[in-house]
Amino acid sequence: MAAPASATESQASGGPRPPACLLVLGMAGSGKTTFVQRLTGYLHSQGCPPYVINLDPAVHEVPFPANIDIRDTVKYKEVMKQYGLGPNGGIVTSLNLFATRFDQVMKFIEKAQNMSKYVLIDTPGQIEVFTWSASGTIITEALASSFPTIVIYVMDTSRSTNPVTFMSNMLYACSILYKTKLPFIVVMNKTDIIDHSFAVEWMQDFEAFQDALNQETTYVSNLTRSMSLVLDEFYSSLRVVGVSAVLGTGLDELFVQVASATEEYEREYRPEYERLKKSLASAQSQQQKEQLERLQKDMGSVALDTGTATGSSSPVLDPSDLILTRGTLDEEDEEADSDTDDIDHRVTEESREEPAFQNFMQESMAQYWKKNK
């Protein structure tokens, strides 16, 4: 089987493509971290170094070279002390704090896409902490909105030999698929202990699973029998790969499934995300339009209130006219409120001096003629 192409080969074929983000989930003890370690070494050996992110704040040591480590940003034990939390609460709070800066992580991934074709993301051991938390949803949706994102559910094959336990694992995988709505791959880990062929047979052959259930006589087995009918549709479209994280077997087949899942993302999931983005942008545009219309209505009512009384020949002023002519209106108000309204400002001082001078000359001539008589 063909190995994943190196970053240089992808550049030669027409420029770098967005890296595929592999979001590794699984129950505690299923071997997620060991799987990521083996996956990292495999990709390095193929000349395709991945970009690795550790999202487990409670891990003591990371057995792989992490490009981004949540422990460098959030101190798990300090969070527990400061907020008085237990182990799970500390992990959730640490993830919440880290999610507030995930936009910076997205920028780092964008910068690294020239050199890395894959982004490996190791999640906390307690699967529900990431899967059902707000921060887990934020991180998953942020990745899926920009890059091909594939959920890899790591399952402990050695602990799933019991049909009831197997069904519990499948139900959890189904719930994650339903919540994330992303391409999904079930990695049946620890095939070095027991081969995963029995699980594949149970998924493909309903009667074989029923025969295994007939050995169980509990109420749970009856419930499992009913659920197996419901999950038939789920099994038909599920990608399953048997892997040994210890020996490194099954990784070639895994990357064949990853390539198929990436194509599925580009074909089905990306158009859906683009449609959701356009729908959100349209809703925001409609909201802004409605706010503008309400503002225009409010401004129109102000314009009506500033109009003159009925019967007046003066035009009604628009609010913008009030702003532009504010200085003129103030001057008119000052003239109307002046204390010298009773003075005729058209009569100048010069017009008063001429008749007063004529009266003075007439009085002087009269006195002169009176003396000479």
Curated annotation (Swiss-Prot):
Query: Hey, where's the site called Stabilizes the phosphate intermediate on this chain?
Result: N88
Acidic residues composition-biased segments: 330-342
Alphabetically sorted, this entry's keywords are: Acetylation, Cytoplasm, GTP-binding, Hydrolase, Nucleotide-binding, Nucleus, Phosphoprotein
Q: Name one Pfam family in it.
A: ATP_bind_1
Q: Per the Swiss-Prot or TrEMBL record, what residue ranges does the short sequence motif Gly-Pro-Asn (GPN)-loop cover?
A: 86-88
Phosphothreonine PTM sites in chain numbering = T328, T340
- Which top-level enzyme class is recorded in the Swiss-Prot or TrEMBL entry? hydrolase
User: Which residues are annotated with the PTM Phosphoserine?
Assistant: S301, S312, S314, S338
The answer on whether this UniProt entry bears the keyword Nucleus reads yes
Q: Point out residues bearing the modification N-acetylalanine.
A: A2
- Ranges annotated as biased composition (Basic and acidic residues): 343-355
Q: Where is this region: Disordered?
A: 304-373
Q: Which GO terms describe its cellular component?
A: cytoplasm; nucleus
MF (Gene Ontology):
ATP hydrolysis activity; GTP binding; GTPase activity
Q: List ligand-binding residues for GTP.
A: G29, S30, G31, K32, T33, T34, N189, K190, T191, D192
- List localization entries: Cytoplasm; Nucleus
Source superkingdom: Eukaryota
Principal subcellular localisation of the protein: cytoplasm
Q: Which InterPro entries match?
A: AAA+_ATPase, Gpn, Gpn1/Npa3/XAB1, P-loop_NTPase
Q: Please name the PANTHER family in this protein's record.
A: GPN-LOOP GTPASE 1, XPA-BINDING PROTEIN 1-RELATED
Q: How does it assemble?
A: Heterodimer with GPN3. Binds to RNA polymerase II (RNAPII). Interacts directly with RNAPII subunits RPB4 and RPB7 and the CTD of RPB1. Interacts with XPA.
Please report which protein family the annotation says this sequence is part of: Belongs to the GPN-loop GTPase family.
Q: What the protein does?
A: Small GTPase required for proper nuclear import of RNA polymerase II (RNAPII). May act at an RNAP assembly step prior to nuclear import. Forms an interface between the RNA polymerase II enzyme and chaperone/scaffolding proteins, suggesting that it is required to connect RNA polymerase II to regulators of protein complex formation. May be involved in nuclear localization of XPA.
Annotated protein name in UniProt: GPN-loop GTPase 1
Q: Which organism is it from?
A: Bos taurus
Q: What is the lineage of its organism?
A: Eukaryota, Metazoa, Chordata, Craniata, Vertebrata
